[in-house]
């Protein structure tokens, strides 16, 4: 598979340790292992479909038992960056729970410092500067989460966010609402595991905590009506999630290990319905995957094209927990690294209105809600819901727009649904943001297909 640079937003440090390293560290720490060679240990570490949750989590318990010294943490952090960089990753956010590594006497601050040193060492040789996300464990008391947040706040800069992770059933994210709010007030981002092991009610609980991203989230499909492989209606939680345009950090192989085969994964249906999705490895060693393999699976089993993969990579860069200038540089690097061009946004307007607006050099649409809007940087284009806009209308022009030039849309960037309107998006759209203008009449029955020239449009005015 040939592809451009990848961005990883959901990767657990303890889930990606090389089996040979686990064996070395366990021997050094005097921790018993279920196998005496790396290959056999790798087979044992791999989570199998249908495995009970407690048995699956025992794999992490073994790894974490060996990660109780500064040197062990430094080593696995460095190796994680090496492995990700070798797979074509140019930005990574590694998450872990520092308080799970204090059994040997280290304080949480020492744990974070050891991991940071490992990241710094690998950055010198790979050029990949990874960031850290501190996990709160959802089954632990609020006081423990407060301690984790304290450590995260103290390490702001390299630590960019907090997460709520661990076993979902019986442990809603709202149990940690106080620590989450305190982290946000201190300037940290928030991502929350939800809808991975349990249903949409866990996503509702996560949304109540006002996250910036959702880990996994695929079980939101249980709050959708589906017919003929398409989402036909959204329930209240699904509507809230889509309307919020929150990124879903989808992990195909990891979900398959918990019983959802990749070929039956709803990620494409969710993208078609306007949800903001991306692909991530989750636990590279324990689920035997990599960022590259996640894209290969999406291509081979879900029919994702290279243009769509490039779009997901760009959007992951937009969703990264970085300062604005670093995010802009990352987006530019990712876009330049793919051999395909992704039309970011398409605005459909009456041709006369658009031509009149060009005379002034900017497009300031009145009554914007009368116009149609399509976002093309998802996995797939959403066709059916927009028919209400096209049916019976003629003399339309499709204006292919570069989202990165629209009213600081690099930071804001809307969701993916065609059935959405964003009157606040166009503060002032300069003609230099336009990539192409294409006549776009609907078909006689009101349905439409995106013409190839629209998909390939790259001409800048």
Residue ranges and their predicted role:
Residues 10-12, 193, 216, 265, ...:
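Histidine-centered active-site/metal-ligand motif
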Residues 192, 227, 256, 371-375:
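Short, surface-exposed loop/turn motifs that are enriched in glycine and acidic residues
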């Amino acid at each position: 598979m040939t592809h451009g640079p990848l961005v990883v937003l959901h990767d657990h440090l303890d889930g990606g340790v090389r089996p040979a390293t686990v064996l070395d560290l366990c021997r050094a720490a005097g921790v018993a292992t279920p196998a005496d060679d790396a290959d056999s240990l790798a087979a044992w570490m791999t989570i199998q479909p249908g495995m009970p949750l407690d048995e699956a989590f025992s794999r992490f318990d073994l790894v974490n038992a060996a990660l109780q010294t500064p040197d062990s943490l430094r080593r696995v952090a460095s190796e994680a960056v090496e492995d990700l960089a070798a797979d074509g990753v140019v930005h990574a956010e590694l998450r872990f729970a520092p308080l799970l590594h204090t059994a040997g006497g280290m304080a949480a601050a020492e744990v974070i410092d050891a991991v940071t040193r490992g990241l710094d060492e690998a950055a010198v040789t790979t050029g990949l500067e990874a960031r850290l996300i501190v996990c709160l464990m959802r089954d632990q008391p609020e006081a423990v989460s407060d301690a984790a947040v304290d450590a995260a706040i103290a390490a702001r800069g390299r630590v960019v966010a907090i997460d709520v992770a661990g076993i979902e059933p019986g442990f809603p994210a709202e149990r940690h609402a106080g620590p989450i709010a305190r982290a946000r007030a201190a300037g940290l981002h928030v991502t929350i595991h939800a809808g991975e092991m349990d249903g949409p009610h866990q996503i509702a609980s996560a949304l109540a905590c006002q996250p910036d991203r959702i880990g996994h989230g695929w079980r939101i499909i249980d709050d959708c009506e589906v017919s003929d492989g398409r989402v036909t209606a959204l329930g209240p939680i699904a509507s809230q999630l889509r309307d919020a345009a929150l990124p879903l950090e989808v992990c195909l192989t990891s979900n398959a290990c918990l019983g959802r085969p990749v070929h039956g994964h709803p990620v494409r249906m969710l993208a078609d319905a306007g949800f903001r999705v991306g692909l991530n490895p989750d636990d590279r060693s324990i689920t035997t995957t990599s960022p590259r393999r996640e894209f290969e699976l999406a291509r081979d089993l879900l029919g994702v094209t290279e243009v769509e993969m490039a779009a997901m990579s760009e959007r992951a860069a937009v969703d990264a927990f970085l300062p604005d200038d670093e995010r802009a540089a990352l987006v530019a690097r990712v876009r330049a690294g793919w051999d395909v061009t992704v039309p970011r946004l398409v605005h459909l307007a009456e041709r006369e209105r658009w031509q009149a607006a060009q005379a002034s050099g900017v497009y300031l649409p009145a009554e914007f809600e009368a116009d149609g809007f399509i976002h093309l940087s998802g996995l797939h284009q959403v066709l059916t819901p927009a028919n209400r806009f096209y049916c019976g209308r003629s003399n339309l022009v499709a204006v292919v727009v570069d989202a990165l030039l629209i009213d600081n849309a690099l930071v804001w960037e809307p969701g993916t649904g065609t059935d959405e309107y964003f009157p606040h998006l166009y503060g002032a759209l300069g003609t230099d943001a336009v990539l192409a203008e294409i006549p776009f009449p609907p078909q006689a029955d009101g349905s439409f297909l995106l013409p190839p020239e629209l998909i390939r449009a790259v001409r800048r005015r």
